């Protein structure tokens, strides 16, 4: 008896077969019409109206018209009521000429389907009118046990719910995992250290993304406290964003991400754990509370189904299984709930007769609470004389790192996370931040210690002097393989952060971080030059101007 109501944007030919499109290999003949034409203004008005309608209890159920459009949203909701009757003639269209099946399956993110009690319909329609949102009754939920679709007063579609929801047999897939052969640290090839440091900053995955980011508005409603770029020139990277949600409250939210697909070449488990740690690490680096955070997972995978054209499908599926286990284990360790997610399992294309597949990739996006946005911490160094501390042990892994890609040869095992240890460290750091002890904080990710050091110096337009002999290491660092400077500067061991502290706060800082793996590795300087020493001698000195030019990819290095 509930009415099926569609709210939001009108239906068009865009977004037809979008779900099918995302599950097939791309080619030169893939239809552009499968991609939805976004309308963010319509979507925003619809979402605000729905929140108000929810608070007033004007609907009993809601789902989006994403993959599959009305066929999916109303078909899913019909599983609760026991059936649905859909009238395609009532559906508002962008233009005439759509076939009934096109109206039924066109998908969009700015359309939603509601279940509305008839007695509340008038109030819902009036609210939608006042909020300038189109709302239309397009059917009725029934007990027929079927999805009935009508167009031009004629029944054009009829499916039993049992077939719709359970009619497709479950696939029986084979996953085959071959663990990589354990190997000790691989000797680092000789290189021009200074040149390598600049090339790391110019590498496409490390270099500035300002040209892209500035195309988007990150000042909406003046709520952004920490923006994508920070520092005196507003051109150094942040570890994420901090937003003030309500003007009258100091509480805010952080938004961070974690993604490291190259680590997955050897093991999807390690990749997933490192992605979670990177998102959590960025949240904590901004001043976020590690006890208050949530995340969503986005899996982007090459076809994991074995077949004649996909002989390694069983391994790709095993990587997916490993990644799911790594994600689950890391989230449990951090008490991190996954509140949403998405997957795309057919990221393959044929271009000029050649098959191209993406790497197995997991993106973790995190939103958490920062108790006081006034205590938010940014990556840029603040003043000469501030003391530099490196938190977390460096284990010297170079596999899958930016440096390995520049070296052009395998450099051993990739990074692996230890979430339980990291969580203890993050709690201690957060307590120190709440006390106002931390001046700057930057997580170590792509490019390792060197990239973090260079970016923080660039942000403050201040130099730094560090001693690699002081870097906290574990027995796994691989010092016996030589080239220690490269290993310590460029390894991407997770759960590490670069922190600056005022000299007068040193005692408070050490008390707050008692028992944590950390070491004082240097200090901030006024000479706009980053100096690195090892074994009692200077191994590199690079000026801020050179760092800026390299990081902004003026003549940068391709990925």
Segment roles from a protein language model:
Residues 2-559:
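Glycine/proline-enriched, intrinsically flexible loops and inter-domain linkers
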């Amino acid at each position: 008896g509930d009415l099926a109501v569609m709210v939001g944007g009108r239906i068009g030919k865009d977004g037809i077969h979008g779900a099918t499109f995302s599950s097939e290999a791309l080619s030169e003949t893939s239809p552009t019409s499968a991609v939805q034409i976004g309308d963010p203004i319509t979507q925003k008005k619809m979402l605000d109206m729905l929140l108000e309608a929810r608070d007033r209890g004007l609907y009993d159920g809601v789902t989006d018209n994403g993959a599959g459009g009305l066929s999916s949203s109303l078909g899913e909701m019909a599983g609760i009521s026991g059936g649905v009757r859909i009238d395609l003639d009532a559906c508002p269209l962008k233009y005439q000429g759509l076939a009934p099946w096109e109206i039924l399956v066109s998908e969009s993110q700015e359309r939603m389907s509601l279940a509305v009690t008839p007695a509340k319909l008038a109030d819902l329609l009036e609210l939608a009118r006042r909020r300038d949102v189109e709302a239309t009754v397009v059917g009725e939920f029934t007990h027929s046990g079927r999805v009935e679709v009508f167009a031009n007063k004629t029944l054009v579609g009829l499916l039993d719910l049992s077939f719709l929801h359970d009619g497709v047999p479950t696939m029986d897939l084979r996953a085959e995992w071959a663990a990589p052969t354990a190997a000790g640290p691989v000797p680092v090839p000789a290189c021009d250290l200074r040149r390598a440091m600049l090339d790391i900053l110019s590498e496409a995955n490390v270099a500035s993304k300002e040209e892209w980011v500035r195309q988007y508005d990150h000042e909406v409603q003046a709520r952004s406290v920490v923006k994508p770029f920070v520092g005196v020139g507003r051109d150094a990277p942040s570890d994420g964003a901090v937003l003030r949600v309500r003007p009258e409250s100091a509480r805010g939210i952080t938004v961070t991400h974690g993604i490291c697909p190259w680590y997955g070449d050897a093991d999807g488990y390690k990749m997933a754990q490192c992605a979670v740690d990177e998102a959590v690490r960025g949240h904590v680096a901004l001043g976020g509370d590690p006890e208050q955070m949530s995340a969503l997972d986005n899996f982007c995978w090459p076809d994991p189904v074995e077949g004649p054209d996909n002989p390694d499908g069983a391994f790709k599926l095993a990587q997916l299984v490993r990644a799911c286990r790594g994600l689950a284990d890391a989230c449990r360790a951090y008490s991190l709930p996954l509140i949403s997610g998405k997957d795309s399992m057919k990221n393959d294309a044929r271009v000029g007769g050649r098959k191209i597949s993406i790497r197995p990739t997991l993106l973790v996006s995190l939103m958490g609470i920062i108790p006081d946005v006034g205590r938010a911490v940014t990556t840029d160094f603040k003043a000469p004389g501030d003391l530099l501390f490196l938190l977390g042990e460096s284990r010297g892994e170079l596999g899958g790192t930016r440096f390995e890609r520049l070296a052009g040869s395998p450099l051993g095992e990739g990074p692996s996370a230890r979430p339980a240890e990291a969580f203890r460290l993050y709690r201690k750091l957060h307590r120190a931040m709440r006390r106002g002890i931390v001046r700057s904080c930057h997580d170590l990710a792509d490019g390792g210690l060197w990239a973090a050091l260079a970016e923080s110096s660039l942000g403050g337009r201040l130099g730094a002097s560090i001693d690699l002999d002081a870097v906290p290491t574990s027995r796994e660092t691989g010092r016996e393989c030589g080239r220690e400077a490269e290993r310590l500067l460029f390894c991407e061991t997770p759960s590490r952060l670069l922190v600056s502290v005022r000299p007068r706060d040193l005692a408070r800082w050490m008390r707050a971080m008692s028992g944590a793996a950390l070491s004082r590795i240097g200090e901030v300087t006024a000479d706009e030059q980053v100096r690195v020493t090892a074994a009692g001698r200077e191994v590199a000195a690079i000026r801020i101007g050179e760092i800026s030019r390299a990081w902004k990819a003026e003549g940068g290095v391709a990925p």
